[in-house]
Amino acid sequence: MAPSKKAGKKVTPKKAAGNNAKSKVAKADWKEGFKKKQVGVTDMTLLTTISNESINENLQKRWTNGEIYTYIGAVLISVNPFRDLGIYTDEVLQRYRGKNRLEVPPHVFSIAESAYYNMNAYHENQCVIISGESGAGKTEAAKQIMQYIAAVSGGQDSGIQEIKDMVLATNPLLESFGCAKTLRNNNSSRHGKYLEIMFNDRGEPVGAQITNYLLEKGRVVGQIENERNFHIFYQFTKAASDEQREAFGLQGPDAYAYTSMSNCLDVQDIDDTRDFEGTINAMQIIGLSPEEQNEIFKMLATILWLGNVQFDENEEGNSVISDTGVTDFVAYLMEVDAATVQKALTTRVMETTRGGRRGSVYDVPLNPSQATSGRDALSKAIYNNLFEWIVAKINVSLKTRSAYSHIIGILDIFGFEIFEDNSFEQLCINYVNEKLQQIFIELTLKTEQEEYVREQIKWTPIKFFNNKVVCDLIEERRPPGIFAALNDACATAHADPTAADNSFIQRSAGLSSNGHFESRGAQFLVRHYAGDVMYNVAGMTDKNKDSLIKDLLDLIGTSGNAFLQNLFPDRPDPNSKKRPPTASDRIKQSAGALVDKLMKSQPSYIRTIKPNGNRSPSEYDTKAILHQIKYLGLQENIRVRRAGFAYRNTFEKMVERFYLLSPKTSYAGEYIWTGDAKSGCEQILKDTGIAKDEWQMGVTKAFIKNPETLFALETMRDRYWHNMAARIQRAFRNYMRYKHECARRIQRFWKNNKEALVYAQVRDYGHQLLAGRKERRRFSLLSYRRFMGDYLDISGKSSLGEEIGEACSLGREPVKFSASARLLVSKLGRSSKPSPRYIVLTPKAVYIVIVTAKDGQAMFSLERKIALVTIKSIQMSTLRDDWFTLNLGPTEEGDPVLSCYFKTEFVTHLMQLTQAGINFNIAPTIEYTKKKEKKAQIKFVKDETIPKDDVYKSHTVHVPSGEPADSVSRPPAKRKAGVVRPITQGKLLRAGGPSKPNNSRPRPTAQPLPGQSKPAVATPSVVSTPAAAAVVSKPKPAASTPAAVRAPAVTPAARSVPPPPPPPPPARAEPEKEMYRAKFDFQGQEGEMSLTKDDEVELIEKDENGWWLVKKDGVEAWAPYNYLERIAPKAAPAPPPPPARPRPTSTVPKPPLSSTTADASAKPVAVFPGMGASNGGPTPWKKSAATTDSTPNSSRPGSAAAKVPPPVAAKPKPPVVAPKPGVPKPGGKPALPTTARPAPSGGGAAAGRLGGGGGGPGQLDLAAALAKRAQRIADED
């Protein structure tokens, strides 16, 4: 609503406030001071004095202030503003959605919301009855109710949306064909309609049906001065297309007698051209085909041209057609013979009967007056049947597509009419309004008081006028009423309308005994509830017969237009002796059916009032409105409402609706009350805290006095489900937090171990390559053995690695494998002898590097580079030795024969790089090619006298027995059980484990609801134990590690050292509360926490809107978050340190710089995560990110059939997982060091590299570190 401006006050436009200006809260606060103040009372039951004058004064105050709606309890009073107040926008509509009438100002949307809510909540049909004078705003109210229901009824299905569109499209279509301008209303409904919208059990519209009542067809052929015909005629004549004008000979509205006789062609605020476009669009939405639309317009053109047929009187006094060209065009439109049209309009066929047998047939000429009546009768019949056809077509389109459960009906019917000349049409209209008033009285006054007496409710009777006596005066048969007298007059003098009218006058004289009827010769007076109306008898019996003469029906029967013939499906049977139903019969039958429908639904009332007869937005006619207040019975309605009860229902339905509100009648959503429905209903009302004077218990029903009480019950019921939903959501969120915490733990473990999995996959691939054909060394099968590849750390840029990389000129080429090895070297005149080397494997080649001494410095040089594409096969023996040969093609240098501790890993990486394109042979002997293509062979012999490794001498390798050939890696060693932190973040468990279930209150047995035959099946109570319940356990003693897995001790002294006791577990911490301290003073309002500076509060819940739920002294309330600062949690006491463990003494001798042979202890036993470097310092476990897999550029020949495809061994670099802010991590691992590893000890890089023997000094340092690690594991075990 726009802010009101005071006179003479300058209003400065406000500047935009950036993004904050878009906030809904800020916008509402800005408007708070500009809201229009309420004038008068919104509910007239609150008036201090109850009189017609006080009601009128309250309505006038509100209407003058632009507030046209006022309540009397649940009845809405609407005063037509005759202007657009902007109160039907989408924004206003949304404010009424889901609100009861006490939460928002009075509005027609509130009535629509109440009807829709009650239908869904109570599963009862609803109807909205709109009554009032013509021009009071009934049609507009019905349109807004339909608009609201279409907006809130949901349903995204295309079929449901189509139903909504078609329901809304009926408004412009029926307004065009059924509304006209009258002296009192520019858009007066000249018919009545009852729209029934069908809904499924989800509250979605699935169909609709329209019932039409009493179209004022007489308006087609005549209107009084300054009124108009139906809108469609002016729309059609003004906005028809050129094709239509050509086909139908169409001209402007001034060219036709039916549209120009009242001298009113245009109406202010009505655009006929624009409305015609809306009519065409509505026809398309409803589903009328272009052919059907064309036939409709042809019928309209036929009616217009029929009105232009004029009659002259000849010498004999008979009628003749003035212009036969008009009748010729009418015959063209009706597709009949022109002569037949002329004859049907100017003559009448009369048939005589004699003794019940057919006699002679005569053509009786008609005088001009009779011919004009026949012409008008034909026009009225065509238009009336056309309107009925359109309504039937709409109902076919709106037919339900699926099953429906409930209905909302909207009654928009003609208002009470009092004119200077009142005839049969006004009698029927006022009769229907009398019936509606009777329904209002029956349901709101008479029936209600009778129910109070029947239910023995304390009640003060209210006197009121019951208009049933007026309804009986019009519709009763015995004694005969007005309609019965009309029918008798038509039956006795059916041939002569004048004689029939005189007969009716005589018969109606007998009705004078009724105090509400008065006969005055050719007129009679009826005292309606809305006032006294004088009716003229002339022509009333003819209108009551409402039938075409046989000649005109025969004319239509000869038409070649099938559409025209379909408009008249029922032809009277000339041989039938049964009297055809009259217009009064049909209107009485329709009104009775309407009353039956309305009585089967729960009604909502809208009483419309017309403020003046000039359609002025500023004129308030106090006298006219006071008259409407009186005949609408608003004063009696207020008295009954104040003395009565707003809501009543049977005990069974009350219990079924509200049993959830009492803990004695419900448990976990089940009905548990064992008493009768009445006692259960009384228990519910007591437990909800409702005052005793607000409700009474009757014989079969419970009565609630004020609607506020009912709304409170509904709010509590809605909150019950909301609270239950919140509990379920809270439990689900706890479950999700628990689940996410478990997932995070798994993810952390995975991030810390996923690289190890990659290395283990490569190791398993190595097992597949060997395929149980070669004996294994025990240390090759350790569970912690990983195929890490680059043992010389060439990719890591260590000092040794840089030297080797420069010697090989690797550049950016990634290194897949590097280690120390021995190469079998042949010397002139001497037997071959192993010599230390370094071997490097890249995706392109194998590099063999030799170290020589020059001037006391180590010099690295590339001895040989072997391209991978030149390697044909690899050979190994079946024993546990370390020898293998790379068989190449014809070369001068021959095949290299190498001995390497990591031979299996080298072969595995080589097979991966070549996609298993190399033959891999394992046999008791290996063959290789020496220089100049000389063949040689090495034999392998088992020799148990060899203490360890193997010994080469004269092409024979002596090797001890190893592990069986089918051996695989040992399973991972069991870690020592420590104190596991329980997963309690989701609050599913208390710290320390789950609590025992509370069995203090047994689960009640479910009972059947009142009206049910079988009790509801009780859901078994299932107590589920979360998976986190078992995570807190006492530390178990470490299981002994098998000898095959545990590394041997190095010295006896180390074995004698007892293992240290495990550290004590940390004290079990109580659940940590998140505490905050107030930074400033804060004065809270209702629902807010008042704070004093330095107050300490416990945080319960955070909300995104800036308010936090806190707890202080056992009270929970909301506080602004920026007034609080967190109190740092107290650090948990550290556990006592474990006793110091004596450091084992290593007996591994440090290799001298001049050593040239490998020491036996230099053999690597395993590769462990976090193993020491050559100098005993820490070494990162993961490989460098520079190491990647690649494939040789050239393709290789096919390999042997026994090849195993390598697994994908990608090595992603794990991201560093940072701890969550604000969450302490006691005992967490420190971050990995980011600096480079220190250089090996022993007197500098050169000194460390000049070591000889076996695997080289670098390998010796590595072996020493491994030995220390093995000793440490042995000590721990």
From Swiss-Prot:
Keywords, sorted A to Z: Actin-binding, ATP-binding, Cytoplasm, Cytoskeleton, Hydrolase, Motor protein, Myosin, Nucleotide-binding, Phosphoprotein, Repeat, SH3 domain
GO terms assigned for molecular function: actin filament binding; ATP binding; hydrolase activity; microfilament motor activity
Domain TH1: start-end pairs: 776-965
Compositionally biased residues, Gly residues: 1241-1258
SMART domains: MYSc (SM00242), SH3 (SM00326)
Domain IQ as annotated: residue spans: 722-742, 743-768
CDD domains: MYSc_Myo1 (cd01378)
Domain SH3: 1071-1129
Residues recorded with modification Phosphoserine: 360
Low complexity bias: start-end ranges: 1015-1056, 1226-1240
Localization terms from the record: Cytoplasm, Cytoskeleton, Actin patch
Bias (Polar residues): 1145-1159, 1185-1197
Pfam entry (one): Myosin_TH1
Gene Ontology biological process terms in this record: actin cortical patch localization; actin filament organization; endocytosis
Sequence segments annotated as region (Disordered): 1-27, 567-587, 952-1072, 1129-1259
Composition-biased stretches (Basic residues): 1-13
Domain free text: The myosin motor domain displays actin-stimulated ATPase activity and generates a mechanochemical force. The tail domain participates in molecular interactions that specify the role of the motor domain. It is composed of several tail homology (TH) domains, namely a putative phospholipid-binding myosin tail domain (also named TH1), an Ala- and Pro-rich domain (TH2), followed by an SH3 domain and a C-terminal acidic domain (TH3).
Family according to the record: Belongs to the TRAFAC class myosin-kinesin ATPase superfamily. Myosin family.
UniProt-recorded name of the protein: Myosin-1
Organism annotation: Coprinopsis cinerea (strain Okayama-7 / 130 / ATCC MYA-4618 / FGSC 9003) (Inky cap fungus)
Taxon lineage: Eukaryota, Fungi, Dikarya, Basidiomycota, Agaricomycotina
